[in-house]
């Protein structure tokens, strides 16, 4: 019997695999089961595999199913092991840690404030210690940096320009940590919120730890004195005595703070105390409009540990604003607070990590500046573009000459930036044009610009890693307003064209579709198109037209004048500079390439539906 079985099972009785080179791509439980049955049939030894319910058939089912599951996990694991194919936040977070990329967590709202001192405050140099906060209508805004100012007289005095920024949220003192003395010792703050790609209901209403709001102090076991430690992009850039740490948002959504090993960054000794402070944001509920904080006074943050830290860190000559005289300082926020910005997603990390790796912790090229600002100031800046001094003169200033200005530097927006940020030698200037993330267009009509505090915030961070020869000049873009408009031959275009121009949507009378639905869809298409516009973008009227023509039932588009019997096919717009609407204005139905310093928006877009006419053909 054994001899017969051995003869029948001889390898020569089995066929070749005869699989195509891409057969692996179609393998699943069913194909594997069929392949096993086919090969058993070809061997001629077994027959029960052809009968469902037989023991061998059941065994084949188990093998095929196990193979199917294992293949699924193999494919998933293979995909998640590479940077370009990873889809899970935990995996891509780990992958980019190999190139020292640090994903950004959720960022809280920022408010720019002005500061005034009442007559009761005596003339002197004062410091409002960091973590002091104001509260209005149960909403808190705290400072993560010291605010210093000088009171020069006994009258009511505005003591600080609008260049102070507060972070929305409440200051928190994390439990004291005692160091163990290990090299590269790591302290973790467990975030109660999950990693960014995990879905929660009402995520916008859940408080969170605000990234970039951390302050760390260390008390030496040897001296018993508290000292502030600063964040660094990499400990490997630090000396053995550098009081620096690395911060990282890990794959679980928790913040890690890594200290040195005695060679790269100062090493914590056993018994050293580490105290971490941060801001817990109220999320979107804490975003306030302009003047909401008017009249609020600072409340000095105080705990036994923090009071001792202030005594150790600051010299005896420092005059602090204390709880006894905080009422003599009042603030106001002249502009809206910035929006809350979500943490970097998997797609954001995949886009930003290669760019930040190429920076190598320095700002030299145009791409370096644009990548750095876009990643680190996305709660302040919606769009950014960088021009060299040659480009500034040959493009930006030339634009003002082209619209009739004989002295472009006398333009108020140009002048204020030149005075505040430029130096007498301009050949090394780097001009950063930025569009604010919050309230980009006021009332859908008036262009908005970064305020002085936001520009200074951007400038401070860029100066830390910029090329030593560069002088950074934050600059204001040129805005281009768009609306429906068409002019007849030899007619001088004017802004008023928008008031008697209609967008005519022609729909098939045989298609059952509501006119209101068509108008709403067209409005949505326009809004999406202009929301995606950045500095230097193409305003693609052709794409907008095609998207409208793809609406079911729509068979044609025209732009029509209502004061004269005249219309043109597709979409025609009147385009103008709101600050020079008589000097820079034209009508076009072509796509428009904006210059790198120009930003386009649709003027009063919420009223567009009133200018849409639906006709049946």
Task: For the regions a language model picked out, list residue spans one by one.
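Broad, structure-driven detector of short, well-ordered beta-strand segments within folded domains
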Residues: 141-145, 241-249, 386
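Acidic, low-complexity glycine/serine/threonine-rich segments
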Residues: 334-617
């Amino acid at each position: 019997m054994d001899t017969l079985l051995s003869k029948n099972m001889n390898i020569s009785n089995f066929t070749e695999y005869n699989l195509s080179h891409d057969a692996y791509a179609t393998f699943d439980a069913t194909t594997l089961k069929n392949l096993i049955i086919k090969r058993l049939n070809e061997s001629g030894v077994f027959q029960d595999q052809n009968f469902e319910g037989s023991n061998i058939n059941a065994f084949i089912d188990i093998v095929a199913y196990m193979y199917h599951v294992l293949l699924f996990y193999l494919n998933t694991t293979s995909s998640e092991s590479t940077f370009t194919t990873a889809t899970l936040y935990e995996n891509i977070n780990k992958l980019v840690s190999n190139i020292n990329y640090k994903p950004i967590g959720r960022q809280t709202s920022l408010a720019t404030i002005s500061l005034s001192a009442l007559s009761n405050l005596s003339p002197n140099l004062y410091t409002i210690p960091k973590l002091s906060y104001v509260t209005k209508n149960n909403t808190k805004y705290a400072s993560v940096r010291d605010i210093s100012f000088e009171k020069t007289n006994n009258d009511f005095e505005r003591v600080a320009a609008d260049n102070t920024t507060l972070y929305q949220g409440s200051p928190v003192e994390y439990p004291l940590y005692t160091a163990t003395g290990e090299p590269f010792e790591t302290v973790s703050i467990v975030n109660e919120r999950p990693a960014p790609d995990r879905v929660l209901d009402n995520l916008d209403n859940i408080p969170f730890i605000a990234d970039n709001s951390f302050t760390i102090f260390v008390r030496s076991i040897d001296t018993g004195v508290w000292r502030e430690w600063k964040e660094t992009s990499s400990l490997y850039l630090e000396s053995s005595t550098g009081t620096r740490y690395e911060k990282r948002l890990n794959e679980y959504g928790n913040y890690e703070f890594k200290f040195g090993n005695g060679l790269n960054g100062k090493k914590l000794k056993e018994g050293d105390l580490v105290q971490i402070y941060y801001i817990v944001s109220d999320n979107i509920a804490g975003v306030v409009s302009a003047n909401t904080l008017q009249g609020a006074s600072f409340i000095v943050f105080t705990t036994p540990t923090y009071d001792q830290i202030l005594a150790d860190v600051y010299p005896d000559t420092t005059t602090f604003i204390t709880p006894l005289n905080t009422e003599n300082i009042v603030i106001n926020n002249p502009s809206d607070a910035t929006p809350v910005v979500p943490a970097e997603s998997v797609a954001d990390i995949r886009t930003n990590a290669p760019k930040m790796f190429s920076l190598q912790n320095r700002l030299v090229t145009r791409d370096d500046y644009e990548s750095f600002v876009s990643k680190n100031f996305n709660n302040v800046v919606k769009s950014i573009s960088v021009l060299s001094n040659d480009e500034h003169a040959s493009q930006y200033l030339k634009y003002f000459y082209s619209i009739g200005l004989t002295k472009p530097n006398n333009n108020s927006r140009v002048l204020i930036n030149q005075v505040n940020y430029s130096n007498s030698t301009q050949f090394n200037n780097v001009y950063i044009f930025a569009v604010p993330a919050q309230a980009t267009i006021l009332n859908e009509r008036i262009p908005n610009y970064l305020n002085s505090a936001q520009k200074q915030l951007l400038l401070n961070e860029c100066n830390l890693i910029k090329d030593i020869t560069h002088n950074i000049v934050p600059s204001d873009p040129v805005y281009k307003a768009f609306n429906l408009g068409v002019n007849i031959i030899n007619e001088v275009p004017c802004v008023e064209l928008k008031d008697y121009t209609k967008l005519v949507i022609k729909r098939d009378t045989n298609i059952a579709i509501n006119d209101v639905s068509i108008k709403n869809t067209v409005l949505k298409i326009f809004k999406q198109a202009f929301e995606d516009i950045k500095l230097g973008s193409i305003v693609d009227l052709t794409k907008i037209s095609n998207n409208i023509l793809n609406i079911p039932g729509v068979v044609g588009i025209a732009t029509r004048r209502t004061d004269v019997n005249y219309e043109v096919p597709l979409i025609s717009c009147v385009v103008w500079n709101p600050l020079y609407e008589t000097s820079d204005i034209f009508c076009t139905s072509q796509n428009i390439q904006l210059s790198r310093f120009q930003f386009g928006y649709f003027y009063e877009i919420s009223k567009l539906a009133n200018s849409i006419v639906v006709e049946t053909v």
